[in-house]
Amino acid sequence: MPRTQLIADYLRAQARSRIDRVEKDDHGHNARTAIALIDAADYVTTLDEHAQVLVRLAVAGCFSGGRFDPGGEGERIVGDWHHDLGPADPAELLESLAEAAERGVALAPRPPQPRPAYP
């Protein structure tokens, strides 16, 4: 499945979650977030599969197991994102996700290196 479709599916699922969420005194936050995420999902499907931001997400390991996983920080970015707060447009959302994923890779513990055998 194309990476653009994996991201779009993820964003649409997050939008559905926001639509289903009922919170007292939300003042339309969930609705605005859902609409913004649907817009972002549509935007992603217009990107070339070799767009730099998609390559960055792939190198950071966001496409595994046949799905898009933005990591913990990326999930928080998506969860809090809408047009009133955070990135102003879908391109900025993707850029924020790529930056978060790259930070996650940089901070991840590295596996131990094998020790050379001594004669």
List PLM regions with ranges.
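Amphipathic alpha-helical oligomerization segments
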Residues: R3-V22, Y43-G79
